[in-house]
């Protein structure tokens, strides 16, 4: 699933091609994604200027003069800039057509979303309960420690809760916990503010490095230029159950938390 770095990579890749341009047409080949694409989407954005593209958590927000379009990449989605009249492939479900290029939405598993939020996107139930962005200053050790008070939830699930902090998915939570020396199964409320400071620093550093490297491509994700990300080459423990810990050579273990495998070192993480 594309996580925050992959979504931010997409945003940075497509923005220079589309900002301050107007949509000429919309082509919908398959409208049933996670939710059905609005049939009147064309009337909402045709001839409207795209002012900016923002990211909130794992959502992309296309801010037009007429309102905001939300795009979510789901489990396997991607956005690409293509020349006009580029022939679509099997999983290319939607195109936003501009004067000199088109934005193509591809989603093999069709678990993403294209939704019109109108002029008050902040009122959307998808956005109005999200926690702070992990790269912003309001996501800090004091905040995380306060949120964790008396919480018995494993810390891995805690930092993946979108109401606590947005956009920290399985890959980057696993890596940040390893770098912090914190076991994913330790209760969130049983971690000191000092250790949360280490964890917050690692989360920010890992996300920033992943963005610089174009995200992580494990299966489906490609950037707006069709190229994969390269952060997977620096992963230390994610997806490496049974391999040696890069620090102490102890075999890495995996535990299932909320239906997701979490790989960790039983010696280095406590």
From Swiss-Prot:
This enzyme's EC code(s): 3.2.2.23, 4.2.99.18
UniProt cofactor(s): Zn(2+)
Q: Is Ribonucleoprotein found in the keyword set?
A: no
Name one molecular function that GO assigns to this entry: damaged DNA binding
- Keywords in UniProt for this one? DNA damage, DNA repair, DNA-binding, Glycosidase, Hydrolase, Lyase, Metal-binding, Multifunctional enzyme, Zinc, Zinc-finger
Q: Where is the active site?
A: 2-3, 58, 260
Disulfide links within the chain? none
SUPFAM superfamilies assigned: Glucocorticoid receptor-like (DNA-binding domain) (SSF57716), N-terminal domain of MutM-like DNA repair proteins (SSF81624), S13-like H2TH domain (SSF46946)
Residues in a coiled coil are none
Residues bound to DNA are 91, 109, 151
Biological process GO annotation list? Answer: base-excision repair
Family statement drawn from the similarity comment of this UniProt entry: Belongs to the FPG family.
Record function comment: Involved in base excision repair of DNA damaged by oxidation or by mutagenic agents. Acts as a DNA glycosylase that recognizes and removes damaged bases. Has a preference for oxidized purines, such as 7,8-dihydro-8-oxoguanine (8-oxoG). Has AP (apurinic/apyrimidinic) lyase activity and introduces nicks in the DNA strand. Cleaves the DNA backbone by beta-delta elimination to generate a single-strand break at the site of the removed base with both 3'- and 5'-phosphates.
**Name of the protein in its database record:** Formamidopyrimidine-DNA glycosylase
Annotated source species: Psychromonas ingrahamii (strain DSM 17664 / CCUG 51855 / 37)
Q: By which gene is this protein encoded?
A: mutM
């Amino acid at each position: 699933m594309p996580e925050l770095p992959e979504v931010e990579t997409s945003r940075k890749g497509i923005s220079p091609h589309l900002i301050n341009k107007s949509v000429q047409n919309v082509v919908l080949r398959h409208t049933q994604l996670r939710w059905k694409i609005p049939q009147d989407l064309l009337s909402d954005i045709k001839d409207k200027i795209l002012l900016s593209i923002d990211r909130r958590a794992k959502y992309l927000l296309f801010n037009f003069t007429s309102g905001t379009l939300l795009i979510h990449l789901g489990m396997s989605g991607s956005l690409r800039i293509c020349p006009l009249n580029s022939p679509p492939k099997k999983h290319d479900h939607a195109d936003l057509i501009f004067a000199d290029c088109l934005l193509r939405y591809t989603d093999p598993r069709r678990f993403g979303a294209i939704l019109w939020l109108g002029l008050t996107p902040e009122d959307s139930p998808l956005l109005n309960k999200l926690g702070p962005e992990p790269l912003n200053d309001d996501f800090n050790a004091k905040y995380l420690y306060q949120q964790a008070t008396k919480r018995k939830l494993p810390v891995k699930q805690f930092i993946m809760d979108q109401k606590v902090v947005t956009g920290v998915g399985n890959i980057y939570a696993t890596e940040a916990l390893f770098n912090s020396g914190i076991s994913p199964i330790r209760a969130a409320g049983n971690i000191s503010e000092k250790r949360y400071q280490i964890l917050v620093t690692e989360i920010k550093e890992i996300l920033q490095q992943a963005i610089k490297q174009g995200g992580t491509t494990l299966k489906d994700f490609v950037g707006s230029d069709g190229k994969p990300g390269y952060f997977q080459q620096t992963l230390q423990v994610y997806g490496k159950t049974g391999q040696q810990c890069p620090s102490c050579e102890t075999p890495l273990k995996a535990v299932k938390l909320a239906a997701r495998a979490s790989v960790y070192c039983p010696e280095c993480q406590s």
